[in-house]
């Protein structure tokens, strides 16, 4: 029997994971972006993280929350306020990437969101996130 070698997440995956955690903290605490970012970077192990991408994702997602939320609202089965905070953070980040980071292929955005949901979300949240993003991508002409 062979052992599977667990692959380290890519620097961009780590940036997405950290951005989701920072977004979660921002949503819960309502502290200023700068405070959340500084606290997060100070308190977390940022080794192997694409720091410029982390900062861009976190700051730009927060800056674009109204646009991101209005984009995803028609595809949710409940209001954004009723979503689990981790699911909301993952969806916000992914919708931001789908809408504004056009150099990132939509399949990569969706797959990364699913993987982050498997790591941080509830048992079946990755299925919910996949379903929502799979509907949003074509609406943004990303397919």
UniProtKB/Swiss-Prot annotation:
CDD domains linked to this entry: Terminator_NusB
Does the keyword Transcription regulation belong to this entry?
A: yes
Which of UniProt's keywords are assigned here? RNA-binding, Transcription, Transcription antitermination, Transcription regulation
Q: List, in alphabetical order, the Gene Ontology terms for molecular function in this entry.
A: RNA binding
Asked if the record carries the keyword Lipid metabolism, the reply is: no
* Cellular component, GO, one term: cytosol
Q: Which InterPro entries match?
A: NusB-like_sf, NusB_fam, NusB_RsmB_TIM44
Source organism superkingdom:
Bacteria
SUPFAM superfamilies assigned: NusB-like
GO BP terms in the entry: DNA-templated transcription termination; transcription antitermination
Cystine residue pairs: none
Write down the Pfam families for this protein, in alphabetical order: NusB (PF01029)
Family assignment from sequence similarity: Belongs to the NusB family.
Please give the function described in this protein's UniProt entry.
Answer: Involved in transcription antitermination. Required for transcription of ribosomal RNA (rRNA) genes. Binds specifically to the boxA antiterminator sequence of the ribosomal RNA (rrn) operons.
Question: What's the protein called, per UniProt?
Answer: Transcription antitermination protein NusB
Q: In which organism is this protein found?
A: Mannheimia succiniciproducens (strain KCTC 0769BP / MBEL55E)
Species lineage, top-down? Bacteria, Pseudomonadati, Pseudomonadota, Gammaproteobacteria, Pasteurellales
